[in-house]
């Protein structure tokens, strides 16, 4: 802005152009010999119509500055101060520091006619530039809005594509994991099937051996029956013969009787052994029938075991996330405490500045009253001393300007402090809300995991006592669920 060229226009041209653009009935005399009302009206209309500042913003002090003052006393001064601050910043920013607005330009513009003409010429220049640049600016703004809309649309499409990509990757990982699980289940099933086939082969061999033993026992029983018939026939034959030696015959009969008793005991033991082998054969047949059910239950237990392992992994991950969230919450609480301490320190600093400002304001007010009293005394007692009166007025205006500058600085610092506090408060509330939601979600997930993991493993099949031999059952093959509650947290 250092290459700004200031042009001073003719008063008639200035009055005509400003009158058209600012909707005012101006004449050349209003620019040559301006009054305070005309100057304030020109700047106020410029701020409202060109800079688009609302009427309420020109009459109301911002934020905390709008307190601790008498509205009736400052009814006229507040709009002038706000208008002065707005136009001063505008002229300083756009004139390359070649022009500067003072309070005298608003209160007593007639004393500096050439300066007021420069200011109005600057406003005319800006209005011309504004009139030329507005169509191009609107066109660029529309094009920028269209491009921005297109960029937003493209960004949404990219986000949607990224989301679809992530979903596909997640589905792919789930599918691969499911394939690995199926492969593991297939390998386990093959191993179980191999074991069952081996058991079936062993059972078949045992059945064949039992059949052989049964046939041998039947042959042995037939042989015993033949011997019994032979013994009976021998006894009958001996009864028919003449007893030549009764003692010898009696002894032979006793021996035959003992032999028959031994054969009978052997027959009973053979029958019992055969009955036990038949029962073992029935048990093997029933076990062969129950092999598919056992395989199915093994598969179910394998799936339940995988689900339990997955739930344990999910629980560990949730516990880790919960620990991280607690650490983040502690960190944010520490940051909030630090911010509160800083806020308290800033409040104390602001309070100290306010006290100093109050003291300085009282001192300035007292000085203003003294100068006003001196001016009144000079007017009544010494009317010829106009130079000293003007000097006192200049001092009074300087004090007022310094007071206005101090008020604006304090207002800006208060606005910054309030904005920082609002930002910190919003950040703390948002962090607290997110932490509470995450903590609640983690607690719910923990309860859900506990409720899902502490339940029974359902089973529809149980072995009966008639299908398993108590003498050969050395391992606990009963798949019936235990009454004790299962829990991974024990």
UniProtKB/Swiss-Prot annotation:
It comes from the Eukaryota. GO terms for cellular component: kinetochore; microtubule; Ndc80 complex; nucleus. InterPro entries: Kinetochore_Nuf2_N (IPR005549), Nuf2_N_sf (IPR038275). It is found in: Nucleus; Chromosome, Centromere, Kinetochore. Its main location: nucleus. Residues 346-365, 468-490 are annotated as: Disordered. Keywords: Cell cycle, Cell division, Centromere, Chromosome, Coiled coil, Kinetochore, Meiosis, Mitosis, Nucleus. Residues 146-280, 310-407 form a coiled coil. One of its GO terms (molecular function) is structural molecule activity. GO terms for biological process: attachment of mitotic spindle microtubules to kinetochore; attachment of spindle microtubules to kinetochore; cell division; kinetochore organization; meiotic chromosome segregation; mitotic sister chromatid segregation; mitotic spindle organization; reproductive process. The keyword Cell division applies. Component of the NDC80 complex, which is composed of at least ndc-80 and him-10. The NDC80 complex interacts with knl-1. Acts as a component of the essential kinetochore-associated NDC80 complex, which is required for chromosome segregation in mitosis and meiosis and spindle checkpoint activity. The ndc-80 complex synergistically enhances the affinity of the ska-1 complex for microtubules and may allow the ndc-80 complex to track depolymerizing microtubules. This is Kinetochore protein Nuf2 homolog. It comes from Caenorhabditis elegans. The gene is him-10.
